[in-house]
């Protein structure tokens, strides 16, 4: 399945910096749409339906959600939510920052009510010894990451945080599309054949 994603990275940023930045961008986008795109929103049946969420967005810890709602916490909480929210501390790939002492991950996903996850991000690992330890622990082939390891060994990687946001997912949520393919110019959906 093909999709469009916007990725960004900020040197020396914290997770909180990125989360606040994303909240500003999302709220600003929704305000602009309400102000400048009234006619288009009316065509889509969304005029007056877009609400600008309050900041800061609520933050949940993934471990606590799983303990309270079980493995399928995502579907339950997404359906119950009225505004966008963050989920933090998600075990992921080696490049997300992990505190070995606490076992917590310094990362975050943004979820949209009734739709699901739209953005994933994290503070990044930059220290060579931690990257190698995590690659070994997770059984990841180091030769696949030669350049990254070389840069880390030479202390050429700076601390940073960033994220990637699914553009079509965001648009689908705004217009309440039934399927993400409905907001793609040229949807390529596995198993779907379109007549020309």
Segment roles from a protein language model:
Residues 28-43:
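Flexible helix-coil linker/hinge segments at domain or subdomain boundaries
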């Amino acid at each position: 399945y093909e999709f469009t994603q916007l990725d960004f990275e900020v040197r020396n940023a914290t997770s909180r910096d990125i989360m606040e930045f994303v909240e500003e961008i999302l709220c600003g986008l929704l305000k602009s749409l309400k102000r400048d795109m009234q006619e288009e929103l009316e065509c889509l049946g969304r005029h007056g339906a877009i609400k600008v969420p309050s900041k800061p967005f609520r933050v949940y810890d993934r471990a606590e959600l799983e303990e309270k709602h079980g493995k399928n916490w995502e579907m339950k909480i997404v359906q119950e939510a009225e505004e966008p929210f963050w989920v933090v501390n998600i075990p992921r790939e080696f490049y997300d920052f992990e505190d070995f002492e606490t076992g917590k991950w310094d990362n975050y996903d943004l979820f949209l009510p009734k739709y699901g996850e739209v953005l994933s991000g994290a503070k990044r690992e930059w220290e060579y010894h931690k990257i190698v330890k995590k690659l070994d622990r997770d059984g990841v082939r180091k030769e696949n990451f030669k350049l990254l390891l070389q840069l880390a060994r030479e202390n050429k990687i700076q601390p940073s945080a960033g994220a990637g946001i699914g553009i079509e997912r965001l648009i689908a949520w705004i217009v309440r599309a039934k399927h993400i393919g409905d907001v793609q110019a040229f949807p390529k959906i596995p198993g779907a054949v379109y007549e020309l």
